[in-house]
Amino acid sequence: MNIKDIGVIISKKPLKENTFIIRVFTKNHGLYSGVIKESSKKNKFIYQEGNIVDFLWKARLHEHIGIAKCELIKSYTGYFIINKAKLYAFNSVISLIQELFHEREEHSIFFFISN
């Protein structure tokens, strides 16, 4: 099963030394989690929270966590770091998305409003 969509990186949690689990809020498919491997220091900045990415998710079955690959579209990291109020607002929105939305439920209207 393959899914390709535009999304916002919501969280990144370590799994092993260079392996992480990322959570992405996609435009047409909702929240998806996937395993990524940071192979070099060059692609570390891609997986920062708040970045808009071209998200590719592959798994054998729909229920599996899957392997994720991301291509950076736009980075908002510097935009949030400059202003504390924007950083707090962003963190609040991220927390709400994680708590209120279920995995793999489409929320394209909210995605459009948040961008």
UniProtKB/Swiss-Prot annotation:
Gene3D superfamilies reported in the protein's UniProt record: Nucleic acid-binding proteins
InterPro entries: DNA_rep/recomb_RecO_N, NA-bd_OB-fold, RecO
Pfam families in alphabetical order: RecO_N
Single GO biological process annotation from the record: DNA recombination
Protein name from the UniProt record: Uncharacterized protein RP548
